Amino acid sequence: MSYNSIRLPQDLPIYYKNFFPVKPFTKWLRYGQNNGDYFNRREFAFILADDVHIRYRSYNDEHAFFKALSSTNPEKLDIGAVYNHEPINNKRHTDYQAVERELVFDIDLTDYDPVRNCCKDATVCPKCWKFMVLAVKILDFQLEDMFDFKARMWVFSGRRGVHCWVGDKKARMLNNYQRSAIATRLNLFKKNGQCEVTEGRAKMTKVPPIVRDAFNVALKDGVFEKMIYDQGWLDKEDFITEYKFMSEVGRDDLRSLSETYKTPQERWNMIRGLFDDDYRKSLSPKDGLLDFKMQGRDRNYLLYFVLQRCYPRLDVNVSTGTNHLLKSPFCIHPKTGNVAVPLNVGKIEEFDVSKCPRIDHVVEELSSLLAERGNDENEDSKNRKFLAYKHGALAPYVENFEKFVSACIS
């Protein structure tokens, strides 16, 4: 049964008071510094019912932040930049400006609608989630390999997308120009929604490392092959004409072979046999594909076929502005009731969107969690403050979050 948003006014106060992980949250946004020197210059925005925005909120410490959060109970919480003055006093300063902010990325499933056949718009199913699995794996690899960013957190938005927060100091100190340069370099969708897998002059066939690495990550664990069958990409013969740089000779070869290789599984093996040099090494003459040798840009067909479908489709504007607001981890999506939970990249394929912690289910756990604590005979446990977010459905996601926080301040 889907979430009834009428419940939000009764669920939010219980959730914020008992389950929002305020201690690790404020520890993260302090980055090891004293409250009065840093945390108090961070902007928070509370979004209330009817999309009422309260911006430029700032707080001296964890206690003040939690008091405001648990008394206001916003439907959504956004995190902004660190400014040179306290945001709450922004109108007092003519030089008020953002000076620091995590590097962030936003990937939305609706941007995959041109290649997503199982669902459309805001609907998400397990087949859809594979798009996010590969997008996260590819971009996470690139952020470490290309830029040596270590503190990376991936958060399910609560409905149909994921957000990435990069907390390394060198990432937080980037200016807008540098952020734009990174986002532009990582974005392969430059014109007309087409993924560019080569660079240089029109007739050149140079494949940059970013493309080759993304391709290798995409094919590593077999997720992409499952997507081929889930989405029906090889059921029809559209795949023959989709690559605009393919020569007529190359198209004729594909068309001819597709009459022999008719099932999606056969066609996938055929395509790899024609365009994947490593895969070709495993073929024998009897397979009939070694007689075909693609030339020029035809050789890049498989790169395009794969990355057009699974390369991260970034909302570049989210990444370029230091002062951009982004939805906080552990806030609630008001329409689905889902908690925006940090993900474990190593286990991202196991994440089931339909089983994401939902606010009504989370708050309903409280009585049983308190009862379990009451039955605990360990006196030390009883004397410690009970942190409900350390127990129940949210616990593994809080653990993911705390690992990110540790990476940020180490």
Swiss-Prot record:
<keyword id="KW-0235">DNA replication</keyword>
<keyword id="KW-0548">Nucleotidyltransferase</keyword>
<comment type="similarity">
    <text>Belongs to the eukaryotic-type primase small subunit family.</text>
</comment>
<dbReference type="InterPro" id="IPR002755">
    <property type="entry name" value="DNA_primase_S"/>
</dbReference>
<feature type="short sequence motif" description="Zinc knuckle motif">
    <location>
        <begin position="118"/>
        <end position="129"/>
    </location>
</feature>
<keyword id="KW-0804">Transcription</keyword>
<keyword id="KW-0808">Transferase</keyword>
<keyword id="KW-0639">Primosome</keyword>
<keyword id="KW-0479">Metal-binding</keyword>
<dbReference type="InterPro" id="IPR014052">
    <property type="entry name" value="DNA_primase_ssu_euk/arc"/>
</dbReference>
<protein>
    <recommendedName>
        <fullName>DNA primase small subunit</fullName>
        <ecNumber>2.7.7.-</ecNumber>
    </recommendedName>
</protein>
<comment type="function">
    <text>DNA primase is the polymerase that synthesizes small RNA primers for the Okazaki fragments made during discontinuous DNA replication.</text>
</comment>
<feature type="active site">
    <location>
        <position position="108"/>
    </location>
</feature>
<dbReference type="Pfam" id="PF01896">
    <property type="entry name" value="DNA_primase_S"/>
</dbReference>
<dbReference type="GO" id="GO:0046872">
    <property type="term" value="F:metal ion binding"/>
</dbReference>
<dbReference type="GO" id="GO:0005658">
    <property type="term" value="C:alpha DNA polymerase:primase complex"/>
</dbReference>
<comment type="subunit">
    <text>Heterodimer of a small subunit and a large subunit.</text>
</comment>
<keyword id="KW-0240">DNA-directed RNA polymerase</keyword>
<dbReference type="GO" id="GO:0006269">
    <property type="term" value="P:DNA replication, synthesis of primer"/>
</dbReference>
<keyword id="KW-0862">Zinc</keyword>
<feature type="active site">
    <location>
        <position position="43"/>
    </location>
</feature>
<dbReference type="GO" id="GO:0003899">
    <property type="term" value="F:DNA-directed RNA polymerase activity"/>
</dbReference>
<feature type="active site">
    <location>
        <position position="106"/>
    </location>
</feature>
